[in-house]
């Protein structure tokens, strides 16, 4: 197992000095965080915590991921029990593993090593009902954390939507300050499940926004003028009412793939969180026609093709580095 080498703090767009953690007394607060899962998002969580002065021990099933993390100042653990053994009392553990069975499997391994004073954070895209169940079943205090920002969070920080006990949230505030864009980039949404509920709806809104941009650019693409779509996106994103990060990614897509999106397929993957959003809306008798139509377009994209769907396919790579399906 590689030996941990502490790396110097780096200054980013949100400088480390802006994200220093302090106790109510004004004294610096360096916490010891355990991170389980060093994929794209988990590694960013660990890196930003280390950059802010916190100690991080991490476990991943990939030996390569652990070796790379060790080179970056993260203490590698040989197993989940080994990770738990390195942490103090209370233990602070952040799960960043795929939703569903992997979360339950990690919690099962952690269970013998947890006490009521510990805090476990699930930063993945879990269903809010699963988070409610896990909070009730887990000995430790449980925080469900909707995480938005994709790989760009490495530089900018994430937006964190957190549910669970208020005392646990306050204890981990220094870590949330480090991982998020700053103090304004995270908040407690409510009790267990609320964080992942808000993130679910966030994803539904994201579907509708992607669909709207896709339809607009499809009309421009098929319209009566020979337009430079990259220039349109750039112009819109400088002062227009509809400016956004997604629109920046539209500009990037046209610049890198060309005005016709090259060989980008019309197959748009994903859809689970959008499905959850629509089901919840039906249960609550809330009309969400834009989200519903966007979800339907995504499913239809797997059968036939449109320019708007090809753009949505490419945008998923832009914000989340998801696979681009190509012809």
Which residues are covered by each model-predicted region?
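Serine residues within intrinsically disordered or low-complexity segments
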Residues: 15-17
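ATP-dependent carboxylate/acyl-activation modules
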Residues: 31-38, 45, 178, 317, ...
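Rossmann-like NAD(P)-binding element
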Residues: 40, 61, 74-133, 154-163
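Hydrophobic beta-strand scaffold residues
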Residues: 56, 76, 142-143, 288
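Rossmann-fold dinucleotide-binding core
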Residues: 106, 126-204, 211-214
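Helical "substrate-binding/catalytic lid" subdomain
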Residues: 171, 193-322
């Amino acid at each position: 197992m590689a030996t941990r080498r502490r790396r110097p703090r780096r200054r980013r767009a949100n400088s480390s000095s802006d994200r220093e953690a302090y106790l109510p007394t004004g004294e610096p607060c360096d916490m010891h965080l355990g991170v389980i899962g060093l994929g794209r998002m988990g590694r960013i969580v660990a890196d930003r915590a280390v950059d802010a002065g916190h100690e991080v021990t991490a476990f991943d099933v990939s030996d390569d991921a652990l070796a790379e993390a060790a080179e970056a100042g993260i203490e590698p653990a040989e197993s989940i029990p080994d990770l738990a053994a390195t942490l103090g009392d209370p233990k602070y553990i952040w799960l960043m593993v795929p939703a569903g069975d992997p979360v339950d499997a990690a919690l099962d391994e952690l269970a013998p090593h947890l006490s009521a004073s510990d805090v476990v954070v699930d930063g993945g895209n879990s269903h809010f009902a699963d988070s409610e169940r896990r909070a009730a079943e887990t000995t430790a205090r449980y925080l469900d954390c909707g995480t938005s920002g994709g790989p760009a969070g490495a530089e900018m920080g994430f937006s964190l939507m957190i549910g669970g006990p208020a005392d646990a949230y306050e204890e981990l505030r220094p870590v949330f300050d480090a991982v998020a864009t700053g103090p304004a980039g995270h908040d407690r949404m409510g009790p267990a499940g609320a964080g992942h509920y808000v993130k679910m709806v966030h994803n539904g809104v994201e579907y509708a926004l992607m669909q709207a941009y896709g339809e607009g650019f499809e009309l421009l693409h098929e319209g009566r003028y020979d337009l430079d779509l990259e220039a349109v996106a750039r112009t819109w994103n400088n002062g227009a009412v509809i400016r956004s990060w997604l629109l920046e990614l539209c500009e990037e897509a046209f610049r890198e793939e060309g005005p016709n999106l090259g060989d980008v397929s019309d197959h748009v993957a994903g859809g689970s969180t959008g499905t959850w959003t629509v089901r919840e809306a039906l249960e609550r008798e809330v009309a969400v026609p834009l989200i519903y139509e966007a979800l339907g377009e995504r499913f239809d994209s797997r059968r036939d093709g449109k320019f708007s769907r090809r753009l949505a396919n490419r945008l998923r790579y832009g914000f989340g580095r998801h696979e681009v399906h190509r012809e």
